[in-house]
Amino acid sequence: MSIKDGWKGRFYEDFDIGDIYKHPLGRTVTKVDNIWFTLLTQNTASIHFDAHYASKTEFKKPLVDSTFTVALVTGQSVTDISQNVFANLGWEEIRLPNPVFEGDTIYSESKVLEKRESKSRKNVGIILVETSGYNQDGIVVITFKRRVMVYKKGMSPLSSRPEMKK
């Protein structure tokens, strides 16, 4: 028998420009997700929670709040991209080419576009990824670029994790 560490995510050295990560988890968006998120964020646009109103639009049904889509697809990418994040530096060029509806299942993948050493911090590097989210039919519903500072190997707080006493 051997003791094996669980997945600890990628560190700066693990990324190569051009790498594509197909994030492992899909997520079906529910009516509750949409209503809860619009209430939580105080988004009062009727298109998100008034089925009668939405039935009169070109979409014929409520749209999922687009900021939920940003949050969901960002979250899906964490396991592969930013599990060892020092800081999220922001999103760029967020595009929402197609709507998300209640009942859609969203999947995502990210491509590494840039990688460089941090000029001010020796324990991290900076990567730029382009992430795309798509539904169960393969239709792209969101794309964005995200820049993150990622710890180098042996430099993260996880490196000082204590062992269980026996």
PLM regions with names:
Residues 1-90, 153-166:
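Hot-dog-fold acyl-thioester-processing enzymes
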